[in-house]
Amino acid sequence: MRILITGAASFLGRHLVEYFLSKEEEVLALVRENARGRDELLKYEANNKFKLIVLDMKDIERLDIDFDVCIHLAWGGIGKEGRMDENIQRENIDAAIRLMRVCKERGAKRFLFAGSQAEYGQTLSDIESKYGNDFDINTIPKQSEDFPTKPKSEYGKAKLELKSKLKNLGDSLGIEYVHMRIFSVFGSGDHETSLISTCIKNFKENKDVHIGECIQSWNYIYINDLCEAVYLLSKKDLQGEFVFNVAGENNRILMDYVKDIKRLLDSSGDIVVEKKEAASEGLPFLNPNIEHLKRIGFVESYGFEKGIKDCI
């Protein structure tokens, strides 16, 4: 099987390239000219199953090699300002639609798109207004794939809009569409300012970690587990389903993850809680249900603690 991975120089992309190559699949890694992380893909050039393609998404019609499956990760405007920029997100929508048409020309049969938990739009304030400040996450309905979607950001709105647009286009072109609602992924190579990266760095050095209250429900999936989930979604009979939450098996209060990292590193650094300004889209409240993913054979092999041990 030959796989095209767009956004291959990203954190998720680099790990997926490595994972699919480990499964003896052919990988076409598509990156833009100045992509951060591009150089980290050069180590695979000696592998005859790997091909690096330098091409901007705006020129995607120039892609001239056939493939079987597309995993579309490339996306502009993922930072704080970009997530709320409607024009940037419109460009992403247009690029994804054009890419699917190219997939038809190049013989692809399945198209996996990196959707997001941001499509749900559920926030801590939503939960507190409905259940009060002393909520119990075990009594709050989980976010299954048919859970109401009320995205707060232009980023989330764009990802959600593509769910129906790409599904309909895929049906008309004879391409099976898979919409992956990816939750919070961690692992080596993640952004150095992420909560996990910050906690590991500071606790390793026995330094304090300054964070917000972290009282919302959260879900982490380790990058190796995510790669396995995406691999299954690229290969398995999906039994008519096309929307899948891609997340870990456990939903927990965010602060509990922070405490686990401190414990695993046996750190003398303290957890310092500070009042932090929430993003304009609010504090996400993540409590996904992954039964759809489990039905196609997904088992979380690593989980949070083993994943953290791998990182440290």
Cite the ranges covered by each PLM segment.
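Short-chain dehydrogenase/reductase
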Residues: 89, 141, 147, 151-160, ...
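C-terminal substrate-binding subdomain of Rossmann-fold SDR/epimerase-dehydratase oxidoreductases
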Residues: 203, 207-312
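N-terminal Rossmann NAD(P)H-binding glycine-rich loop of SDR-like oxidoreductase domains
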Residues: 3-23
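NAD(P)-dependent short-chain dehydrogenase/reductase
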Residues: 125-138, 160, 164-218, 223-227, ...
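NAD(P)H-binding glycine-rich loop region in Rossmannoid oxidoreductase-like domains
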Residues: 54-91
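SDR active-site strand-loop-helix element
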Residues: 6, 30, 70-76, 111-117, ...
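Conserved Rossmann-fold NAD(P)-dependent oxidoreductase catalytic core, especially the SDR/UDP-sugar
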Residues: 72, 97-154
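Conserved catalytic Lys-bearing alpha helix of Rossmann-like short-chain dehydrogenase/reductases
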Residues: 93-99, 156-166
